[in-house]
Amino acid sequence: MDFSKAFQYKKWANNELLDIGEQQFSILPERDATFFVRILNHTTVVDSLFISRIMGEPEKYSGDNTVETPTISELRETMNQNDSWLVQYVGAATKEDLKRVVSFKFIDGDTGQMSIEEILLHLLTHGSNHRGMASRVLAENNLERPKDTFTRYLHQLEPSRRVGG
């Protein structure tokens, strides 16, 4: 499986959501604004945990979210670092790399094993799920939300796909 476009899309979708969310952040009720940041921060922490596991390095977090809620700019910085790492990694990964099995401990202490390919698929689906939750907060407040679809990303990236459809 070629993950390159999927992780480029993930990075694009994260930036789209943060851009639109940040523009309207002051309009959100405090509880919803906090949820918006914390649910996206959760995905960023989980990305970081699995990146550490892929690299065989110590994990930077002891939970699946941080105690303190980051600012949107702090969240954006960490999210972009993770997304950039993932885009670079999948661009260079071989089929053998993707089949490699990683053993690790989940945050709750249970042990687990996943192939790199399974980890990457988890990060894609997990991130999409929680972007949807954050986007729902915008919708519930009658605010603009991104059109977070892979098809939109592909057609924006390659406008020639619209010709002759």
Regions found by a protein language model. Give the residues of each.
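Exposed alpha-helical structural elements
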Residues: 2, 49-50, 74, 85, ...
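Glycine- and aromatic-rich loop/turn segments at beta-sheet edges
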Residues: 26, 98-103
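Short amphipathic alpha-helical surface micro-motifs
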Residues: 33, 81-85, 103, 133-134
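Short, contiguous alpha-helical
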Residues: 4-65, 107-165
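Helix-adjacent hinge/juxtasegments
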Residues: 59-100
